[in-house]
């Protein structure tokens, strides 16, 4: 199989939507029966985004194999069926650390290590490895052309045309075409300068995606084609839309997929976008709306919860309702009280790390439990639900997590290496033990309890979901909590860890240790989010009676 490469770069400004554009194009090519994958190359020096601030970088998207990656990989998985892995995302820091490790081992036989060829070769090797077994690989280069950090990646993708052949490589450049209200026209000069910058690096773009708040007129596209040395049919207008799921159809309507298939000599049938048309129809024709509050600590940057927000929208699609998401800072709940939670049809507490805002989340979980409001807790959202239930229902005063209070009387949540035996003694587990010593990452099997709500929602005894956490339910204190009315609805495949809890006498109260948002897609949804949004609709109807 010959693999073809489409390299996606951005110019003029950041946040043009390279990831969405790449994912949308991949969706069309996949709909033509081609085997497609997408890679994201990030120019920052962090080895991975795992320890980066969510309010700076956005969410960390976790893959099946446990890689902590850029949030764009979430977009990729929501648009195409191919599952991402650690091969689909790497950073400057990762490349440099690998090259330096090889140098220390003597792999380079005393050679002087340089950006060219050693760093660029390492980048190219990663790209080729990530694309194995696919007809088309889209490679998104993070940042903006002209950034000093991006230069090694841009040089590497320039060399790819030499290594694999120009007939198997394409360069797609996203650029801004701003509308000037005073002049009453769009301006192409920023695009011309951006392409000039790219040409100075040695890359001639084959396709230009022109981002604007309105359609770029044909005469302006012709002008761009002339000055940028690109065929007119390869100058694509991509205006702002109210739904990102309209973008595959917009690209297809301008013949971009035909142009690419012809360029790569790919004999593929016409794309069938019926599934995407169905998604767009569902989104545009809701039968109602629900208000769901998400109480977190990173709400100043919604991208910190990107997959959760999208999963809630997918749940709305499956129930034919619009989901209005109210982002609430958990610290505001601490200072201003649960009045902030009024007029909500459901409440969700997502994952997070650290003590800041935890008391507000505990107040939120208590409010949802006592007022029979549908509740979905994810990761830390499950842990605070457990802590709140232990304190206020199981009479375990001061119940807490060892993440926040290491020497608390009732450590109902503890580090994976910290477990209490039957006598109450702390049992230490090292990295050599079965459960490992740090973060639990990636897909893990979960056995669902017969008769539980989640068993009904999933329609299966066994599920696989993705994890990202260091703390787990302390089994030694579980019996007392269960006796007070909490039900364990799911356990790990080895029956050692609690994965899901429910409150049976509550209309809809589910909390899970894993992250179901990472596997939700607009076409398929996710059982937990579909059930959660349905419960919100039913709660709203009960109140209206």
Swiss-Prot record:
Region Amidoligase domain, annotated ranges: 1-266
E.C. code: 6.3.4.2
Gene Ontology biological process terms from the UniProt entry: 'de novo' CTP biosynthetic process; pyrimidine nucleobase biosynthetic process
Record pathway: Pyrimidine metabolism; CTP biosynthesis via de novo pathway; CTP from UDP: step 2/2
Disulfide cross-links: none
Subunit structure: Homotetramer.
Protein name: CTP synthase
């Amino acid at each position: 199989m010959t693999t073809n490469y489409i390299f996606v770069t951005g110019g003029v400004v950041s946040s043009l939507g390279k990831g969405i554009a790449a994912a949308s194009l991949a969706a069309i090519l996949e709909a033509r029966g081609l085997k497609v994958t997408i890679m994201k190359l990030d120019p920052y020096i962090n080895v991975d985004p795992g320890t980066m601030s969510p309010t700076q970088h956005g969410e960390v998207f976790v893959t099946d194999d446990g890689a902590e990656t850029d949030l764009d990989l979430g977009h990729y998985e929501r648009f195409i069926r191919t599952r991402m892995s650690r091969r689909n995302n790497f950073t400057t820091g990762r490349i440099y650390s690998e090259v330096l490790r090889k140098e220390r081992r003597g792999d380079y036989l005393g050679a002087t290590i340089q950006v060219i060829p050693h760093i660029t070769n390492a980048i190219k090797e990663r790209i080729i490895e990530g694309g194995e077994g696919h007809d088309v690989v889209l490679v998104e280069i993070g940042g903006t052309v002209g950034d000093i950090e991006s230069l090694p990646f841009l040089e590497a993708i320039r060399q790819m045309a030499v290594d694999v052949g120009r007939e198997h490589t394409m360069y797609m450049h996203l650029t801004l075409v701003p509308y000037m209200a005073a002049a009453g026209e769009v301006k192409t000069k920023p695009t011309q300068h951006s392409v000039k910058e790219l040409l100075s690096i040695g890359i001639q773009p084959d396709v230009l995606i022109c981002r604007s708040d309105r359609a770029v007129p044909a005469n302006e596209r012709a002008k761009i084609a002339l000055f940028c040395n690109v065929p007119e049919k390869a100058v694509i207008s991509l205006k702002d839309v109210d739904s990102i799921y309209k973008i595959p159809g917009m690209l297809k309507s301008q013949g971009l997929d035909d142009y690419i298939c012809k360029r790569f000599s790919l004999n593929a049938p016409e794309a069938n976008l019926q599934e995407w048309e169905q998604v767009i129809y569902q989104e545009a024709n809701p039968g109602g709306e629900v208000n769901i509050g998400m109480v977190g600590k990173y709400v100043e940057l919604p991208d910190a919860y990107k997959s959760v927000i999208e999963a809630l929208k997918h749940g709305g699609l499956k129930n034919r309702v619009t989901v209005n998401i109210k982002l609430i800072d958990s610290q505001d709940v601490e200072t201003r009280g649960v009045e902030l939670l009024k007029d909500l049809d459901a409440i969700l507490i997502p994952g997070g790390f650290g003590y800041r805002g935890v008391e507000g989340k505990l107040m939120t979980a208590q409010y949802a439990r006592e007022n029979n409001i549908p509740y979905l807790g994810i990761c830390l959202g499950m842990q605070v639900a457990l802590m709140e239930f232990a304190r206020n229902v199981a009479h375990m005063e001061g119940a807490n997590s060892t993440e926040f209070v290491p020497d608390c009387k009732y450590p109902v949540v503890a580090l994976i290496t910290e477990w209490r035996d039957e006598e109450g003694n702390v049992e230490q587990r090292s990295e050599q033990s079965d459960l490992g010593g740090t973060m639990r990452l990636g897909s893990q099997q979960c056995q669902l309890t017969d008769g539980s709500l989640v068993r009904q929602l999933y329609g299966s005894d066994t599920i696989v979901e993705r994890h990202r956490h260091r703390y787990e339910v302390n089994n030694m204190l579980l019996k007392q909590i269960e006796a007070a009315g909490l039900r364990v609805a799911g356990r790990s495949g080895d029956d050692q860890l609690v994965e899901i809890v429910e409150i049976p006498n509550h209309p809809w109260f589910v909390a899970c240790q894993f992250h179901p948002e990472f596997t939700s897609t607009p076409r398929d949804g996710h059982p937990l989010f579909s059930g959660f949004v349905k419960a919100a609709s039913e709660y709203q109807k009960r109140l209206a009676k």
